[in-house]
Amino acid sequence: MPSLYTHQILAEKVMELLPERTRRYVTREGEYFLGAQGGDVFYLYKMREGQKNLGKYLHRKNVYMVFCNFLEAARSGDGCVTSYIAGYITHYAGDIVFHPYVYSLLNRLEFEDTGNWKGNRHALIESDMDSYFVRKYKELTPHEYKYPLSYSDISCESLFRLMEDSTGERTKRNVRMHAFKTAVKRFIRYNRWLHDGTGGKKKFVYGTEKLFHIPHTLSSLIHRADYDESYFNLERAPWRYPNDDSLVFTDGVDELFDRAVSESVRLITRFFDCLENGTPLEYNDFSKHFLTGLVIGG
């Protein structure tokens, strides 16, 4: 990722900045904000035995094909579909901007790690980013902030058809309405369960993990108010793209967030301009790997 709250706040900021000619395609906030969580929702989609996870597929496979299929689906004029696609593009932009930094940081921390802490460092970094952006943009602690989306805000029928038609022949055979609805419900319930209204839940889960000598995997997902600012590169130290060390940046998380917002606005506008003009999507814009941030095949 970035994680849940970061994607939500990013999508809210993008909505404020979309030009009116593009903003008119976002008529449904529920679908837009679900789209802002991208393929993360479908890590909880139950595939048939032997089939690869749908969330992983959307992050790593046939990215350009999925966007081209989205473009075709948008021709229906269904506001649920166009709103979801706009949100999905914010997720794409957020991931391709933030993920190279997160993986660069993980590589450095792994090199420096003394071995005393065992857990999901990736999740902890992104959870702390969530807490940081909630404090910065909402002026709340993560204990006070509640993810606003509910299942009743979403038309799953339209989105099911979109996903069924957009994920390729091998995958679409395994996209089923009941499983689709269940994945959306699970995603919302799962993140509500992770919400820690007092700070006590994280302490309890962490303590239980410690007692039974198991990695701090689940507790890493629960937001904390006392986040670790060393994860944010506020001092603007240089870092490299892990998959292309010729790309060197000094961006901290504030600069990355701003870049993700501007890239989201640019890509959403470009997508709907292509829809109106009947032109194909630019490959280099819509074919980047969600984890590396680099053009697939580039």
Language model features by range: what are they?
Residues M1-G87, A93-G298:
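N-terminal leader/auxiliary helical segments
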